[in-house]
Amino acid sequence: PTMQTLLAHPPKEITPQPLARLKDIEWIAGPNPLNLVVIGPTGSGKSFLIQALAHNACMQLLSVKYWRLAELAARLDEIRQDIAATNDLVKKISKYHLVIFDDFFTTEISPHATRVLFEIMEARTGQATAIVSQTGASDWGKFIPNQVTAESLINRIMHPSMTIALNGETNLRQTYQPREKL
């Protein structure tokens, strides 16, 4: 989806003013970048929204990286013994204008991956990160055994941030991108 598609069919929870703010890439590349937290149930349009925003950022020549959190965690666990590779990945992720973590704490991740995720968020301080999740920050801590790490990670995500809660009454994928029936 593109920004034009999103503007033509915005989720009802996003009024014109916040939508205009999201279209303006200043929240990503301005002097005070913000994190974006998009919360909603399956089918609520979270991915539709974040893909349109990512496409808009790319069209403005900003660098964007998308990770499903479980895939990032698997990669981090795979290179766990290679400290240099882990540090290189953290450094690489920290350089993007916008990093998107989708399916955020939909499933548990290893304590190692959680610690490195904290390092990534620390390295991204002052840069925009988008979190896409079915649950809010109050639930993420349930997936993180170390409560100090949980509080610190959540604090780095939420401050400073914008939050959009989608209620899921409409499945935007079905509504605006119908597939042919065979």
Feature annotation, model-predicted:
Residues 3-26:
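N-terminal pre-Walker A segment at the start of P-loop NTPase domains
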Residues 6, 50, 68:
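Conserved hydrophobic/aromatic pocket- or pore-lining residues that grip, position, or stack substrates
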Residues 32-49:
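Walker A/P-loop nucleotide-binding motif
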Residues 35-37, 64, 98, 130:
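Residue-level preference for the first positions of well-ordered beta-strands
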Residues 55-67:
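Post-Walker A helix-loop "phosphate-sensing" segment adjacent to the P-loop in P-loop NTPases
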Residues 31-32, 60, 93-96, 124-127:
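Short loop/turn elements that form and flank the Walker-type P-loop nucleotide-binding site
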